[in-house]
Amino acid sequence: MSGQYPSGYQSPSGHRGNFNSPMMQQQLNQMGVPNQMGMMGFNQGNVMQNQQQMQSGGVQSGPDIGMGQNIQQQQQPNPSQGTGQGQQQQPGQGQAQGQQQQNPQQSPQLGMAAGGQAVSSAAQSATGTVGGAPPGQPNAGPVASTQAASNVQQKEFNLLTLCRIGQETVQDIVSRFQEVFGLLRGIQPPNGTNAGLSSSNDKKAKVQEQFRTIRLLFKRLRLLYDKCNDNCQQGMEYTHVESLIPLKGEPERAEPIHTEEYKKALQENRELIEIVMLKNKQLREIIDKIRLTIWEINTMLSMRRC
């Protein structure tokens, strides 16, 4: 019987002894695969399936629990297969059989430990993803909210800041108008040469650019005025220019106080003025009549002398 097999196979069970070597058994135990080498049919497909399950077990926690149950079921000893194996073994394989009997006791413990580690790692990954915040930043939500609130407060300008910006805008508008007047003062009519045409075109472009900028500044000034008017509780009332800028050479006039007595006195004054005007008219008529009468008397006296 020994001559029918190659030198590497000393017995009919030599190939089974090679697969049951201690190095192969340790690698399989580290991978968490149950000890199925003592069975008659060594199924490589089952080993590959178990390896794929172990690789996928680090990502999902559900399959790991099912795999641990399958491993425990597969790790239960099968007395029928053990008896069959004992009948087919030869005396030269006693040492290998002893190792195989010790390895089934170690492999369930290693498989359960590997399954527990996979389940715990999957649970940690699930909790890490559900939490939404990285491990190094446990309180990132409140910090972000406080930063956003501070940014909103910084963006809100008070009334004094808006007035200062409006003053700077007015000064910018005045300076740009001065530049426009300076450019218009220096413009000369084109003389027909290329240099004259180019210079006039350049000045025209500068003037247009200045007017475009002035238009934008006026829009900005209007927005600032509306913002200040909204912030003011009473609103921005119109004030006379005379009260802000006193005119030189103009006498100061006290504005009358509009009271009931003042209104009555004003009405009486108007009535008296009308009466005086009527009396003046009557006196004028009387004077005219007296003049005519005197003229007639003088005429009669002159005719008698003749």
Curated annotation (Swiss-Prot):
What is the first-listed, main subcellular location in coarse terms?
nucleus
Q: What is the top-level taxon of the source organism?
A: Eukaryota
Question: What Gene Ontology terms for biological process does this UniProt record contain?
Answer: positive regulation of DNA-templated transcription
Locations listed in the record: Nucleus
Q: Which family does it belong to?
A: Belongs to the Mediator complex subunit 30 family.
Note the subunit structure.
Component of the Mediator complex.
Annotated region Disordered: the residues are 1-22, 51-148
Q: Where is the signal peptide?
A: none
Annotated GO molecular function terms are:
transcription coregulator activity
Query: Taxonomic classification, please?
Result: Eukaryota, Metazoa, Ecdysozoa, Arthropoda, Hexapoda
Give the Low complexity compositional bias ranges: 51-128
Instruction: Tell me yes or no: is Nucleus among this UniProt entry's keywords.
Output: yes
Keyword list (alphabetical) reads: Activator, Nucleus, Transcription, Transcription regulation
Q: Name one Pfam family in it.
A: Med30
Q: Name one GO cellular component term.
A: mediator complex
Q: What is known about what this protein does? A: Component of the Mediator complex, a coactivator involved in the regulated transcription of nearly all RNA polymerase II-dependent genes. Mediator functions as a bridge to convey information from gene-specific regulatory proteins to the basal RNA polymerase II transcription machinery. Mediator is recruited to promoters by direct interactions with regulatory proteins and serves as a scaffold for the assembly of a functional preinitiation complex with RNA polymerase II and the general transcription factors.
State the name under which the record lists this protein.
Mediator of RNA polymerase II transcription subunit 30
